[in-house]
Amino acid sequence: MATQKTKTAGAIKAGRGKYHFRVAKMKKVAAGTGYSTSHGGVVEGARMLFGYIHKPRGTGSRMHSHKNEQFNYVVKGTLKGSVNGKRVLAPAGTLIYIPANAPHTLVSTPDEDVIFLALKDLSHGIIGKAVDGTMVGPHYEPGFGPKAASHKRAAKK
């Protein structure tokens, strides 16, 4: 049986007998290649996609946009950033709306990792484009990121 094509590489296609998913246990998909640390299980239906997304503490996305509108529901932790120029501080239990093509950035606060549920229409996949046109990597708060992790490992030796 041929696998149904998805707009997001690595996503699972719902339907044809597939109606429930253990999203927290699914293969992790990069949900912001080149501009974000977001990753998690992604399921696509006929017109919507759903993601169970993880952002490690002190990390997140640089300013970016995508052609599809999006809702993010914060399950654990706190996201901070901006949507269309408006500041956002979203602790667990908060729903964030991101209009199509709206520049936005969301970063996990340094105190704990964030888990959020992402819902997007399928006019586009889960990955957008950085506003500055580069794919140089995600945003890291001071003291976080690959360099900080390697310095911490070296200090323990």
Annotate each predicted stretch with a short phrase.
Residues 1-47, 129-157:
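A short, N-terminal "cap"/entry segment at the start of jelly-roll beta-barrel domains
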Residues 34-36, 51-65:
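Conserved short histidine dyad/triad with adjacent acidic residue
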Residues 40-42, 61-66, 107-109:
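Short histidine-centered beta-strand/loop micro-motifs
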Residues 60-62, 77-82:
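Short beta-strand segments in beta-sandwich/barrel cores
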Residues 68-79:
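Glycine- and acidic-residue-biased ligand/ion/polar-headgroup-sensing regions
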Residues 86-100:
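Short acidic-glycine-tyrosine-enriched beta hairpin
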Residues 100-126:
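Ligand-binding loop in jelly-roll beta-barrel domains
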